[in-house]
Amino acid sequence: MLNIQNYSASPHPGIVAERPQTPSASEHVETAVVPSTTEHRGTDIISLSQAATKIHQAQQTLQSTPPISEENNDERTLARQQLTSSLNALAKSGVSLSAEQNENLRSAFSAPTSALFSASPMAQPRTTISDAEIWDMVSQNISAIGDSYLGVYENVVAVYTDFYQAFSDILSKMGGWLLPGKDGNTVKLDVTSLKNDLNSLVNKYNQINSNTVLFPAQSGSGVKVATEAEARQWLSELNLPNSCLKSYGSGYVVTVDLTPLQKMVQDIDGLGAPGKDSKLEMDNAKYQAWQSGFKAQEENMKTTLQTLTQKYSNANSLYDNLVKVLSSTISSSLETAKSFLQG
């Protein structure tokens, strides 16, 4: 670049002005290097290819077995985090979009915002927005949907599945706790063992820890909490009673509904005192009346799990549909970039 300060006009007519002075070693002359269009397209291809790979991995986790363990949830969370990182790279590189692609992404990632429960407002597109800003908006929103919506449901279903499995383990012992009475008109039920196991399960899920909290989703050490407003919002979304909203530390959490178990224990107490052998003998009519109430509470627990599983499935489908829109857009952009280099 021409440095005008290195030229000096001659004070005498007819004398040629001095030539530019050579910069000293201590001086630095900056030269802007503008990457060629080919180099830019090559960078786009790398970024788009990486994003396409991460999208495929995310789709595989969405199609796998529903999350019922911490390991499954961790795998899904990692896939979502890697997808978000690859989208951030697209935003930084400014991969260009066609007008149709721009509108498709704006439409897809703006529509679901009102249905989500995000701790922070999701990015909203302006009337005029650059391609880089579109990618940034998509990255922010898919991260919020994954962590604050789908991620919550994954945790809810995992915790509730473990809870119901523990209850099912108690049911599996019922055959050994039920014996015939003195004649064909009575039965003997080991109410002490049944009550003890039910109380143990109630006490376990009355404790607030990473294995018992439905919302917020837990990870790492300690217990994460939310504001009361956020917790109440999810309490309503999960259709759980107020007893599931609990204050903990500086915030609030939503826990498993223990009402059915507590009603079971109450009904057992209503049967009367057991004998010295911990069993209670009753006529068939009394037993059948108790059994009917017990099964009704069991059905309530089963219905709650089925409802939460369906809500999780809906959240999974919403996220999957957004990922499909992304996959189509990125595949199209990748083909365009490759065609430019080949053409």
From Swiss-Prot:
In its keyword annotation, does this UniProt entry include Coiled coil?
A: yes
Q: Where in the cell is it found?
A: Secreted
Q: Does the keyword Coiled coil apply?
A: yes
Q: Which UniProt keywords apply?
A: Coiled coil, Secreted, Virulence
Quick one: where's region Disordered? Answer: 1-26
GO annotation, cellular component aspect: extracellular region
Q: Do you know what upregulates this one?
A: Transcriptionally regulated by SicA and InvF. Also regulated by InvE.
Cite a single Pfam family from the UniProt record. T3SS_TC
State the coiled-coil residue ranges: 295-322
Where does this chain mainly localize?
A: secreted
Q: Which domain of life is it from?
A: Bacteria
What this protein is reported to do is described as: Required for translocation of effector proteins via the type III secretion system SPI-1, which is essential for an efficient bacterial internalization. Probably acts by modulating the secretion of SipA, SipB, and SipC.
Q: Which family does it belong to?
A: Belongs to the invasin protein D family.
Q: What is known of its domains?
A: The N-terminal domain is an intra-molecular chaperone that prevents premature oligomerization of the residues on the coiled-coil region that are involved in interactions with the needle and/or itself. The residues in the C-terminal domain probably form oligomeric structures at the tip of the needle that are responsible for the regulation of secretion of other effectors.
Q: What is this protein called?
A: Cell invasion protein SipD
Query: Which gene underlies this protein?
Result: sipD
